[in-house]
Structure formats: C-alpha cells, structure tokens
Amino acid sequence: MINKIHHLQDVNNEMLAYYFNDLKSDTTIFFFGGYSSDMTGTKATALNNWTESNGINYLRFDYSGHGQSSGDLSEGTISKWLGEAEFFFEKFKSKKNIIIGSSMGGWIALLTALKNIDINGLIGIASAPDFTKNEWDK
C-alpha cells in the first residue's frame, strides 16, 4: 500500500507531517518516535507493515523540527512534543488505543497515558524518561 503523507496545523502553527492508514478498525496503534528520529525509520515502517497486514489502524507522525514537519529541532521541548502527540491522539483515537513509544517517544507515551483514560495499552521500546537531564549535564 502507498503511504501518503499528510500535514495538519497544530495549535502552535506548526505543520506536522503524519500518516494514518484508517483501516476502519476499532483499534488504533500510535507510534511516538524518538529524539531526532522521523516516521520513516525502521521501527515506524515495520509497525506500519504489521498493522496493515493485520487490519489495524496506525498513526505515525513527525514532531516539529523532525522529518517532514515544520519547525526547528533546537526550539523543541518535551512539553511541545507532548502537546503534538496529544493533538494526534485526540484526533485519531478509536475505541481501543495502544501507544508504542521509542526512546524519547516512550517518555512522551508515559506522559500521555498519565493524562488520558482512553489508552488500552502502552509499549516502550528503549524508553528514555528524563533523558534530557543526562544530556544537558554533560
């Protein structure tokens, strides 16, 4: 299946790139990528192939300053990227929702789950909660 990339403008006027396969499933899997990663990475595309093979809705996106989204990476913050993840979650959630977060995306997934009862599953892949403290202390 051809993956057509779309863009949505968020509350910060960023044009955020995303792909949603909308297979009319009652389950949606969301992929939250890591710092400086984009939605064309190995994990994101492998999940895309698996969800399409199994008839499950799938949303992947680029945070501002990442991949095909607008913005400057150096102006990003965890709070800003959390808001972007929540923006997509609210727009594309279904009856059952599973978030898979990789690295920084695992941290953002945890923060999203703390604020939202519509999440039925959470998977962290090499989750990096509070990785910024270690990076800035160097």
Language model: regions and residue ranges:
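Conserved alpha/beta-hydrolase
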Residues: 44-70
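Gly/Ala-rich beta-loop-alpha elbow adjacent to hydrolase catalytic centers
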Residues: 101-109
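Catalytic nucleophile-loop/oxyanion-hole region of alpha/beta-hydrolase
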Residues: 66-92
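Short substrate-entry loop that stabilizes the transition state in hydrolases
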Residues: 35-42
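Short beta-strand immediately N-terminal to the catalytic nucleophile in serine-hydrolase-like folds
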Residues: 99-101, 125
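N-terminal cap/lid segment of alpha/beta-hydrolase-fold proteins
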Residues: 1-24
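Short beta-strand element of the alpha/beta-hydrolase
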Residues: 26-34
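Hydrolase active-site cap/lid region
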Residues: 115-138
